[in-house]
């Protein structure tokens, strides 16, 4: 079901046009289709119990998921009405406060993966009173994060068990509920203090903590280590591998701002004819890459200290690649980064691509609301922590033209959270 909103954008079943009955019918139909699909593919049915497997990431499943989620959200809002539907939104800080406590005091690790733990024992282990321990757990249990199988005893659910088992995801959650949650409370103060400036020194993070984010991590290595693990959550490369014809590249891929080189290593293992140079400004990150076991790709990957704010020294490349870097910087800095590639592209064969692998924001209303929301959450996160932003394809195009009028976007191979923008320099 796809209807038009009053402003003409695609909005799915809308509150002004969709009836409760039609939404409910669509939900029933899509839920049945989803269940049938899971069964046909040999997947277990969804469950709140620990050990429940994540659903598949196939195109078929995601299409059913998108349609079902859109209808579920709209039905919930229609049933609640405008006033009641706003209450959970404006009260969400209290839910997040409970989650913050659970992360800070290690609830997810201390409650055993099987069986349960009484609240008195947990409170004693973490060194706080049983009353607040229970209240936090009961708040989370309303989101099916933990369950109270009998009074005063708590056990894992499928959701809480994920935080118990997955250290990287737990670090991502802790990072969000510590640095980011705190910094977000300073958004309005930041804007009031600098109504026309937005960069790392004019960011809510800097307003709250008194230093830009990366300086904060230099001063607090224990939080820097957690941040690094949190960022590791986003290391899946299947979409990147499949959305671009890497096998057609002739020559060396220069991975700029590539950190320890984990993406280049993964691509090298998938495309045995490609070689890689990993560039980063951090000797520590480069050292981590060199220390990895590279025996299976020996001689095909090298490491080089280089800042993407300085002119690119490598010529004759097969491609230049920059992943998840532009969203960390304000527009004027991104222009500097894009300018830095020009010498390298000028000294490479005509048609050598610059591949920008970063979020590509959608045109408003062009995606289902829950998908657009997830992307705009990341855009707000970049504002909060770095005074930076995520960008649309048109915004990338404008910055590219400002950097060099010869830049041209040839194709956006993928959009959303793992966009890939192919850029050429017309020479």
UniProtKB/Swiss-Prot annotation:
Q: Report keywords, A-Z.
A: Methyltransferase, S-adenosyl-L-methionine, Transferase
What is the top-level taxon of the source organism? Eukaryota
Q: Per the record's keyword annotation, is Plastid included, yes or no?
A: no
Concerning Gene3D superfamilies, the annotation shows:
Vaccinia Virus protein VP39, Winged helix-like DNA-binding domain superfamily/Winged helix DNA-binding domain
Quote the record's binding site residues for S-adenosyl-L-methionine.
Answer: 281
Q: Which residues form the active site?
A: 327 (proton acceptor)
The GO terms this record gives for MF are: O-methyltransferase activity; protein dimerization activity
In what pathway does it function? Phytotoxin biosynthesis
- Check the record and name the Pfam families matching this protein: Dimerisation, Methyltransf_2
What biological processes does GO assign it?
A: methylation; secondary metabolite biosynthetic process
Q: InterPro entries from the xrefs?
A: COMT-like, O_MeTrfase_dom, Plant_O-MeTrfase_dimerisation, SAM-dependent_MTases_sf, WH-like_DNA-bd_sf, WH_DNA-bd_sf
If you read the UniProt record, what top EC class would you report for this enzyme, in one word? transferase
Which E.C. number(s) belong to this protein?
2.1.1.-
Which PANTHER family has this protein been placed in? PUTATIVE (AFU_ORTHOLOGUE AFUA_4G14580)-RELATED (PTHR43712), STERIGMATOCYSTIN 8-O-METHYLTRANSFERASE (PTHR43712:SF12)
Q: What does this protein do?
A: O-methyltransferase; part of the gene cluster that mediates the biosynthesis of the phytotoxin solanapyrone, a causal agent of early blight disease of potato and tomato. The prosolanapyrone synthase sol1 is a polyketide synthase that produces the octaketide desmethylprosolanapyrone I via sequential condensations of 7 malonyl-CoA units with one acetyl-CoA unit, and one methylation step. The octaketide backbone is further methylated by the sol2 O-methyltransferase to yield prosolanapyrone I. Prosolanapyrone I is hydroxylated to prosolanapyrone II by the cytochrome P450 monooxygenase sol6.
Identification of the protein by name = O-methyltransferase sol2
């Amino acid at each position: 079901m796809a209807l038009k909103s009053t402003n003409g954008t695609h909005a799915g079943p809308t509150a002004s046009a969709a009836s409760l009955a039609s939404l409910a019918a669509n939900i029933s139909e899509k839920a049945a289709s989803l269940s049938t699909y899971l069964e046909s593919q040999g997947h277990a049915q969804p469950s709140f119990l620990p050990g429940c497997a994540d659903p598949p990431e196939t195109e078929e499943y995601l299409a059913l998921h998108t349609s079902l989620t859109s209808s579920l959200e709209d039905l919930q809002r229609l049933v609640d009405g405008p006033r009641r539907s706003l209450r959970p939104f404006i009260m969400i800080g209290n839910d997040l406060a409970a989650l913050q406590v659970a992360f800070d005091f290690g609830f997810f690790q201390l409650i055993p993966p099987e069986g349960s733990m009484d609240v008195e024992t947990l409170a004693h282990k973490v060194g706080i009173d049983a009353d607040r321990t229970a209240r936090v757990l009961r708040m989370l249990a309303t989101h099916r994060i933990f369950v109270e199988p009998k009074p005063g005893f708590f056990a894992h659910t499928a959701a809480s068990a994920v935080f118990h088992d997955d250290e990287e995801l737990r670090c991502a959650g802790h990072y969000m509920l510590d640095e980011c949650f705190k910094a977000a409370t300073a958004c309005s103060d930041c804007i009031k203090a600098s109504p026309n400036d937005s960069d790392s020194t004019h960011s809510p993070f800097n307003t709250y903590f008194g230093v830009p984010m990366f300086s904060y991590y230099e001063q607090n290595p224990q939080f820097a280590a957690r941040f690094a693990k949190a960022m590791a959550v986003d290391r899946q490369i299947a979409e990147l591998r499949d959305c671009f014809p890497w096998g057609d590249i002739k020559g060396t891929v220069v991975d700029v701002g590539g950190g320890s080189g984990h993406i280049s290593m993964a691509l090298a293992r998938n495309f045995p004819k490609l070689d890689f140079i990993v560039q980063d400004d951090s000797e520590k990150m480069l050292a981590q890459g060199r220390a990895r076991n590279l025996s299976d790709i020996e001689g095909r990957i090298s490491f080089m200290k280089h800042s993407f704010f300085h002119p690119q020294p490598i010529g004759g490349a097969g491609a230049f690649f920059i992943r998840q870097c532009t969203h960390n910087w304000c527009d004027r800095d991104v222009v500097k980064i894009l300018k830095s590639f020009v010498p390298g592209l000028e000294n490479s064969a005509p048609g050598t691509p610059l591949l920008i692998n970063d979020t590509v924001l959608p045109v408003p209303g062009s995606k289902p609301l829950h998908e657009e929301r997830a992307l705009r959450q990341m855009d707000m996160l970049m504002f909060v922590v770095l005074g930076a932003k995520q960008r649309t394809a048109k915004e990338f195009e404008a910055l590219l033209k400002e950097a060099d009028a010869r830049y041209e976007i040839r194709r956006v191979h993928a959009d959303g959270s793992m966009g890939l923008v192919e850029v050429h320099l017309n020479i």
